[in-house]
Amino acid sequence: MKLFSNEIALQNVISNPIYRVRNLNQLLALILILFSHTLFAQQNPLITVIGDSLVGKMVSGESTREVYGNVVLTQGDVVITCDKAIQFISRNDAELIGNVIVKKDTLTIKTPRGFYYGNLAKTRSNAGVYLDDKKVILTADSGDYFFNEDRAFFESKVKLYDTTTTLTANELTYFQQQNRAVAIGDVVIFDGENQIIADTLEHFRNSKITFANSNVRLTNLKNNSEIYGEHLEDYRERGYSIIDVTPLFIQVDTSYIESEDSLKEMQLDTLFIKSRIMEAYRDSSQRFYAIDSVSILKSEFASKNDLTIFYRQDNKIITAKASETAKQPILWQENSQLTGDSITIYLDDNNIKQLDVDGTSFMLSQNEYNLERYDQTSSSQIKIFFTDGKITRADFYGNVYSIYFMYDGETANGLTKSNSAETTVLFEDNEVTEVKLYKNPASEYYPEQQVTGNEKSYLLPRFVVLQNKPTKEEMYKLLNELR
């Protein structure tokens, strides 16, 4: 009837020469005015509320209905039941009180008390909210649900969980149809083995992809490792993660050492790895990549390189150059320095067991008693063996040149320069005790009186002491900044 009367009014206006519409814009504006009530009613249907009893009231000039007992509110396919409802007729809203249950298709929302806004197709509660859509369960102190958008916004002590993942945050927006959640503030997501902490996080439930930003920390409870950074992408189906803004890897190793009274004392040893990009592959090889500007530090062991690959399953670390023209990786172990095109480190119970150096290798060791004296060896390949973290033997292959300072006890006793196709050097307490030359050996001895004060004259061509060794101070400084 309303629509019919609007059509007559429009015809009268158009046919009357006094009120004839002069242009198309005026005609469109007039149509919008005449039909606005009809369009509004179609987009926002009135809510209906029924129950066991009803009391009509005027509150501050506004018409209300209080409905008691077995209350049912409906709007389209949204159905709400509760103990009591106060309907604000002109506003198309209702206050819902007691055992509130909201349903639409597979979605169920429960709360002790809330509101429903008919014109917005929105429900809200700040009395504790529980949402279940048969895919996830979402709880919080307060929350809104927008039915036209299939979107939930929950605040304060938010918790979302499904069969594999639990997520907590201060705020969370859940897009039901997209199976997507955006969380803000003190965000934690846990899948039983890995935990991600961040200031903000976006999680796609179907694809199991997660993006995290600001104060990010990825913890693997299985191997007791953590990666800090400012941006993380985690692809759980692929078993792949990347942190590409200020990443720092930390792994704490607990070991026990025997003291003089034969009691075992616990000792914590932390592995630090810093780089521009870090990638982790959670497959059978358990690979970890540190890419570009890599720094490694663990007890007396340190390294600088372009690329580090850590095979956790095989207890093996490989460092390498990024290109043929790039700088060689550097490795320090106590008072020794090592360079080569690539360095492979074999671990045993988190301790270095063996080092393999390939391609234009150089090793130097500073003497403990005379810091001006360095034992030096250059070759094409090196294999170094360790016992209890100390060097015991080094095998050099391919055009080997060496300089070793000699000692009688702690008394300096000149040096020996030698070359051969292969060389074996034996160590004790990280000091050279014996040098063995194989295949076309040649050597020269220089007495102490020629050597004293002239140590810098006895250097191999590629000798250089590199001063950019990573330190605990810089690693802990970065860690404190990221925390």
List each language-model region with its residue ranges.
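A cross-taxon signal for low-complexity, glycine/charged-rich
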Residues: M1-E7, Q11, R22-A29, A41
